[in-house]
C-alpha cells in the first residue's frame, strides 16, 4: 500500500509541476489579479458597463483558479507529510483518508491535463451549439430534444450557463432546431468535439408497431468572438427577416415581430435569434452569431490547408457522422472517430459520460501546449 502511495504521489508532483509550467503560473495569476482589482476600484470603472462586467468576471475566475490551485497544492503537501511519517503511514484510518485525498487530487490533475489539449486560438471562449433534426421525422425531432437535455446537463456540470438563443418545435413532438449559448471558460474547447452527425437507433415510442428506427441529428459548434476580431460583413451581402417568436406547441410568446433571421449570401450561412426582448437586441445577437460563424469558416479553411500532413488527415468534416447511440437490441454509444465506447446509455444521455468521449477525441485531435 505504502509503495503504491509513493508512486501515486510521484505522479501527482509531476502533474503539479507540468501544470505550473504549461498551464497555470500562480505567481503570474496573482499579479494579474492584483492589477485587475486595482482597476476595479477606480472611480471610472463602471463608466463602461460591458468592460467592467468582463473584468469582474475575470477577477472572479482568477480567484477561483487560485483557490483550486492552492487547495490542490496543500492537499498534495499534506499527503507527502503523512507518507514521510512512519507511524502515520501505517495507520489504517489515515490510509483511508489518504486514498480519498489521492482520488481528489488525481481527478483535478486529470482535468488540468485535459486543458493542456485545449490550446486552440478560441478554445477558451464561450460558444454556440446548434442541433438540427435530420432524416426521421418526429423521431428525429425527439432525438434533438434528447440531445438538448444531454448537453444542458453536461454544460451545467461544468458550471457553464446555458441560454436558448433560438428554438423551433416539432409538429408532433420534440424540437426541429435549437441553438444554445454555452457561457463559460473553455466551453468551445470542449464542445467543438461534438460537431457532426449523431445517429440514434431505437424502438420508436411513436410507432404503434414497435419497429426499430434510425434517426439523425446534426450538431454544429462555433465559438463566440469579441469585437477585437475583425470580420467584414457588407450590408449588401445579407438579408434580414423578422418574424414572431414562438414557444412550445407553436404558441406565440411575443405578439410583435421581434425574432430576427439573417441570411449571409456569400457563405449561405443563416442565423436566427428570438431569445431577447426586442427586435434590436435579437438583431445584435444574430450579427454576433453570424460574425462567429463566418470567422470559424475562415479558420476551418485555413486549418484544412495547414493540416494536410498532420493527424487531421483522418478527415473530420462538419457534416460527417461522429457517434452512434444504440438503445435496442442492445445498449451502446460508440464514437466512430476514436473507437471509444460505453454501454451505459442512460448515464450518457444524462450528460455524465460525455467528458470521456471528448477527452478521447482531444487525445487524438487536440492541440497540445
Curated annotation (Swiss-Prot):
GO terms for biological process: viral translational frameshifting. The keyword GTP-binding does not apply. SMART domains: PCRF. It is found in: Cytoplasm. Pfam families: PCRF, RF-1. GO terms for molecular function: translation release factor activity, codon specific. Peptide chain release factor 2 directs the termination of translation in response to the peptide chain termination codons UGA and UAA. Belongs to the prokaryotic/mitochondrial release factor family. This is Peptide chain release factor 2. It comes from Chlamydia muridarum (strain MoPn / Nigg).
Amino acid at each position: 500500500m505504502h509503495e503504491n502511495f509513493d508512486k501515486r504521489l510521484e505522479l501527482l508532483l509531476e502533474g503539479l509541476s507540468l501544470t505550473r509550467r504549461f498551464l497555470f503560473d500562480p505567481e503570474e495569476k496573482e499579479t494579474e489579479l492584483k492589477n485587475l482589482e486595482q482597476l476595479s476600484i477606480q472611480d471610472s470603472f463602471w463608466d463602461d458597463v460591458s468592460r467592467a462586467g468582463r473584468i469582474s468576471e475575470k477577477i472572479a475566475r482568477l480567484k477561483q483558479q487560485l483557490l483550486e490551485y492552492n487547495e490542490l497544492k496543500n492537499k498534495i503537501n499534506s499527503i507527502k507529510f503523512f507518507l514521510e511519517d512512519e507511524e502515520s503511514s501505517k495507520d489504517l484510518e489515515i490510509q483511508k483518508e489518504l486514498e480519498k485525498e489521492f482520488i481528489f487530487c488525481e481527478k483535478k490533475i486529470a482535468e488540468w491535463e485535459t486543458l493542456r489539449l485545449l490550446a486552440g486560438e478560441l478554445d477558451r471562449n464561450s460558444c454556440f451549439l446548434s442541433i438540427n433534426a435530420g432524416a426521421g421525422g418526429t423521431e428525429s425531432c425527439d432525438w434533438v430534444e434528447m440531445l438538448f437535455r444531454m448537453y444542458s446537463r453536461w454544460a451545467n456540470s461544468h458550471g457553464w450557463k446555458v441560454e436558448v438563443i433560438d428554438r423551433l418545435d416539432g409538429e408532433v413532438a420534440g424540437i426541429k432546431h435549437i441553438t444554445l449559448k454555452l457561457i463559460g471558460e473553455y466551453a468551445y474547447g470542449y464542445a467543438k468535439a461534438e460537431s457532426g452527425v449523431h445517429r440514434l437507433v431505437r424502438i420508436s415510442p411513436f410507432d404503434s408497431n414497435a419497429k426499430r428506427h434510425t434517426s439523425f441529428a446534426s450538431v454544429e459548434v462555433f465559438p463566440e468572438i469579441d469585437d477585437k476580431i475583425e470580420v467584414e460583413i457588407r450590408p449588401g451581402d445579407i438579408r434580414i427577416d423578422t418574424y414572431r417568436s414562438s414557444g412550445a406547441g407553436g404558441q406565440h410568446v411575443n405578439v410583435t415581430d421581434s425574432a430576427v433571421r439573417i441570411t449571409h449570401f456569400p457563405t449561405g450561412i443563416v442565423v436566427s435569434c428570438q431569445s431577447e426582448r426586442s427586435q434590436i437586441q435579437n438583431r445584435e445577437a444574430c450579427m454576433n452569431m453570424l460574425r462567429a460563424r463566418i470567422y470559424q469558416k475562415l479558420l476551418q479553411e485555413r486549418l484544412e490547408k495547414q493540416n494536410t500532413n498532420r493527424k487531421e488527415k483522418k478527415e473530420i468534416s462538419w457534416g460527417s457522422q461522429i457517434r452512434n447511440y444504440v438503445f435496442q437490441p442492445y445498449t451502446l454509444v460508440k464514437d466512430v472517430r476514436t473507437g471509444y465506447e460505453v454501454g451505459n446509455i442512460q448515464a450518457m444521455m444524462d450528460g455524465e459520460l460525455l467528458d470521456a468521449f471528448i477527452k478521447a477525441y482531444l487525445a487524438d485531435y487536440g492541440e497540445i501546449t
